[in-house]
Regions:
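Alpha-helical scaffold domains
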Residues: 2-8, 18-265
Length: 265
């Protein structure tokens, strides 16, 4: 039985802490064997021991902290061919590195589908969506396709991707997000832990967009789900409402703090 992953523990592991900057390839790509050897050299026993606590399969893993993988990726730059080769190894850190090296402009819809079908943890799923997939022109089409999947991590990918687009694509129009709300509503009753948390993430992301219209639609859906007779849908709705309420309160606190500072001058 898979362990429940709290928001706090997810943030501690920090696979999705911020979008990766677009990096040109700065030197010839190493071989897959050389990249594996470098990752193995970065291994940490404590990190390896902790993977299972975050519901990440540890069989064959090296135990490399995510920060170490990111730093190595930054040194290599974009290396799409190497990323594809690393992905084919199936090894955890190799696949994490692949997510940071892959070129969103080069990855094809077929490659996206192939990667997604082989996801075996939320960490790989979210990192691919957050650092590659949301920057492709295929993103919304994949949200619609993957949301219909019965596979737990493919379905999570649909909503992790939707959440990532909501966060990163500041210029995206409202329409594709509004069109995605029925997908959220249908998936909210999926009781599987990683699916329902992905669904909540997507709903919260849409509800935090700058558009008042989107915020209104997202809050209305969250309110409707919170009143559902289905336990999973009710959890998604309540989780989203709590987070959206905090998001509304935060600017008010910031303004109040600013006013206090001004009045004390």
């Amino acid at each position: 039985m898979k362990k429940t992953l709290s928001k706090k523990s997810a943030s501690m592991h920090s696979v999705s802490e911020k979008p990766a900057s677009k990096r040109p390839a700065v030197k010839p790509a190493p071989s897959v064997a050389a990249a594996r050897a470098q990752l193995r050299a970065l291994s940490d026993p404590k990190t390896l021991a902790g993977l299972s606590r975050y519901a990440i399969p540890s069989d064959g893993a090296f135990g490399v902290p995510v920060g170490g993988i990111r730093a190595y990726a930054k040194a290599l730059g974009r290396q799409h061919a190497l990323a594809l080769a690393l992905w084919r190894t199936g090894q955890y850190e190799c696949r994490m590195l692949a997510c940071f090296l892959a070129d969103p402009e080069a990855i094809t819809p077929a490659e996206m589908d192939a990667w997604t079908k082989s996801f075996d943890s939320w960490a790989i799923c979210d990192t691919a969506c957050f650092h590659i997939f949301d920057r492709t022109p295929h993103a919304f089409a994949k949200v619609r396709k993957w949301a219909r999947s019965r596979d737990e991590f493919v379905k999570r990918a649909a909503f992790a991707l939707l959440a990532s687009i909501a966060l990163h694509d500041k210029e995206a129009p409202d329409e594709p997000f509004i069109a995605s709300l029925p997908l959220i509503e249908r998936a909210a009753s999926d009781e599987r832990n990683f699916v329902k948390k992905g669904v909540s993430w997507a709903l919260r992301g849409i509800g935090k967009r700058r558009s008042p219209e989107l915020r209104k639609h997202a809050r209305a859906l969250a309110t409707r789900l919170a009143a559902s007779e289905d336990a999973s849908a009710r959890w998604v709705g309540r989780d989203a409402l709590r987070d959206l309420a905090r998001a509304v309160a935060a600017p008010k606190r910031s303004r109040a703090s600013a006013d206090t500072r001004k009045s004390s001058r």
